[in-house]
Design a protein with these regions (language model features):
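Intrinsically disordered, low-complexity glycine/proline-rich and charged
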Residues: 42-47, 52
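Short, surface-exposed linear patches
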Residues: 33-34, 43-44, 60-63
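Cys/His-rich microdomains that often coordinate metals
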Residues: 17-19, 47
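Short cysteine-rich clusters marking metal-coordination/redox-active sites
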Residues: 12-15, 40-43
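Short metal-coordination and nucleic-acid-contact micro-motifs, chiefly zinc-binding Cys/His arrays
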Residues: 5-11, 33-36
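Short, intrinsically disordered terminal segments enriched in charged and Pro/Gly residues
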Residues: 1-9, 27, 50-104
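Short linker/helix segments within small regulatory modules
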Residues: 25-37
Length: 104
């Protein structure tokens, strides 16, 4: 299985548009939520894109939540680590999209 690869979806942290998916060899995979500089076709520039993987601790719903509540700065970098951001939102009484997955 040396050729086995996993595909990740990437979403632009500036505009939220889905970017081009990237296949990575299993041993070279990054954690879900990883930020990668990619060219965004909608923005017309290189921006940070969040790596989303279904059935992990960070998928599209988590990205949209993080973007909606402003955890990315003007350079599309995270203001708070995602775990800290998630706990902050929970403590503020915000309805978390992953609560149904029992992560808290």
């Amino acid at each position: 299985m040396s050729g086995f690869s996993l595909e990740s979806e990437f979403y632009c942290c500036k505009c939220g548009t889905k970017g081009i998916p990237i296949a990575r060899k299993k041993g070279k995979a990054r954690e879900a939520g990883h930020l990668k500089k990619l060219y965004c076709l909608k923005c017309g520039e290189e921006t940070n894109h969040a790596e989303c993987k279904e059935f992990t601790h960070y998928n599209k719903a988590d990205f949209e939540f993080e973007r909606q509540y402003g955890n990315f700065d003007e350079n599309q970098n995270r203001i708070l680590d995602y775990g800290l951001f998630r706990n902050k939102m929970h403590n503020e009484g915000v309805d978390l999209p992953w609560a149904r997955r029992n992560y808290l």
